[in-house]
């Protein structure tokens, strides 16, 4: 999926939209994402009044409620800086659906379109805007990937994680048999249709584990929560990790090295 990338020199400042699920269930992934950006020389700005992007209400058919939530976000990013989001689902909501929510209000639609053009999913920003080049500082490991439906079908960022992982010599990425299938989370779908969601999550967990990987990676907190929850119910030790945390750890983030595999 083609989109306009920032022209001119590398951005020096970005906004960070954490997402509800990262904030509440895997805050370490948010911190690791911020550290990945800061290590590249980026100043990260975190608007403290940010809330939900409105996606659960929107996909449940509550357009008015989603519009109210989205409207509250429009004024949080006044500078013309990129907005980096560690979730394909939330990034997809902000980029593709915010302008639709305000289609009948020219002023708000213009603000939504301006914001939408600046929204980047984390791996997209690292790869396509910052053009990061990393060295691996971890032990050999095998992983498999789960990409969210929004990353694949809305954002077109489903291959970016693979490209980033390909820079890491000690990481082997194994292909799963249900690569393009949903994990069953789907915002409120997992609550409204728990039996169907549970069956989908079970199939996905099976496909990921059957690869023989040491762990699975995903760039979406909802998918991680759903699949890891299924594995937890089974008392299975196989687990998933957010892509941001894995990249931070593998490129020396927790070992006192810079991103080039050298002592800082």
Show where each model-derived region lies.
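Iron-sulfur cluster-binding electron-transfer modules in prokaryotic oxidoreductases
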Residues: 1-264
């Amino acid at each position: 999926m083609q989109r306009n990338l920032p022209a001119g020199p590398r951005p020096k400042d970005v906004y960070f939209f954490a997402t509800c699920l990262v904030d509440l269930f895997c805050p370490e992934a948010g911190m690791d994402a911020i550290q990945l950006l800061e290590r590249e020389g980026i100043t990260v700005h975190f608007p403290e009044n940010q809330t939900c992007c409105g996606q659960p209400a929107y996909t449940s058919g509550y357009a008015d409620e989603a519009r109210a939530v989205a409207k509250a976000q429009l004024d949080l990013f006044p500078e013309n800086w990129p907005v980096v989001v560690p979730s394909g689902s939330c990034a997809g909501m902000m980029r593709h659906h915010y302008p639709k929510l305000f289609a009948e209000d020219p002023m708000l639609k213009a603000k939504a379109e301006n914001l939408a053009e600046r929204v980047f999913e984390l791996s997209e920003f690292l790869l396509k805007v910052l053009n990061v080049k990393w060295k691996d500082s971890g032990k050999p490991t095998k992983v498999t990937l789960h990409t969210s439906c929004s990353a694949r079908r809305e954002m077109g960022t489903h291959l970016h994680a693979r490209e980033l992982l390909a820079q890491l010599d000690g990481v082997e990425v194994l292909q799963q048999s249900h690569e393009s299938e949903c994990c069953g989370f789907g915002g409120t779908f997992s609550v409204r249709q728990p039996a169907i969601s549970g069956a989908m999550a079970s199939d996905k967990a099976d496909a990921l584990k059957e690869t023989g990987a040491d762990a699975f990676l995903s760039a979406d907190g909802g998918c991680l929560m759903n699949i890891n929850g299924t594995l937890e119910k089974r008392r299975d030790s196989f687990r998933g990790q957010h892509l941001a945390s894995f990249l931070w750890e593998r490129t020396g983030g927790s070992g006192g090295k810079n991103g080039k595999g050298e002592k800082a």
